[in-house]
Amino acid sequence: MKTILSSETMDIPDSVTIKVHAKVIEVEGPRGKLVRDFKHLNLDFQLIKDPETGKKKLKIDSWFGTRKTSASIRTALSHVDNLISGVTRGFRYKMRFVYAHFPINASIGGDGKSIEIRNFLGEKKVRKVEMLDGVTIVRSEKVKDEIVLDGNDIELVSRSCALINQKCHVKKKDIRKFLDGIYVSEKSKIVEEE
C-alpha cells in the first residue's frame, strides 16, 4: 500500500542558517558549515515559515511513498538534526587505552591530525591512524591513558574513533581474555547546554 502524502517538519534554531538546493542541505552555524547530500532519497525538502510563530522550519515530504520511503523521512530529519547539533555544539568522543601488561604508548602528531600507537601487546610495529577531515585529536590532561576527539560532523568523529579501535584489534588470540585495545568510553557535546 502507498501513502499519498507523508510529511514531517522540524524547527530550525535562530543561530543556524539552512540552504536547500536540489536535495543538498547546507547548514551554517557558530562552529562552521556542514553540507549533506540527500539525492539518493526520493523526498522533497522545503524551507517554510511557521504561520503562528514566524519561525523557520524544514519540511520533508514523500509523495506516494512505500513504507521504506516514509521511514526515510525520519532518517533524513535525524541527519539534519545531527548537522544542526554539529554546527552549534559540536561532538566530542573520549577513548581510553585498555591494557593488562604492556602499556600502550600513543603520540599525537600532525597538529592533532594523526596518532601513532606503539607497544600494543608488546609489539614493535607502529600503528599510524590519520584522522578524517575536520576531526582533531588531543590527549586528555586530567585522565591518564585517555584521548579526546572533537569535530562538527558526528559521522566523521565516530568513524575516526572506529579507525583507531580497529587498528588495535587483537588477532589470533581469544578476545575474551585479551581485552587490550583503545575503546570509546564517552560521547558528549563540546559546548554543553546551559
UniProtKB/Swiss-Prot annotation:
Keywords: Phosphoprotein, Ribonucleoprotein, Ribosomal protein
Keyword Transcription attached: no
Disulfide bonds: none
PTM sites of type Phosphothreonine: 75
Pfam families in alphabetical order: Ribosomal_L6 (PF00347)
Natural source organism: Arabidopsis thaliana (Mouse-ear cress)
GO cellular component, one term: plant-type vacuole
Biological process terms in GO annotation: translation
Protein's name in the database: Large ribosomal subunit protein uL6z/uL6y
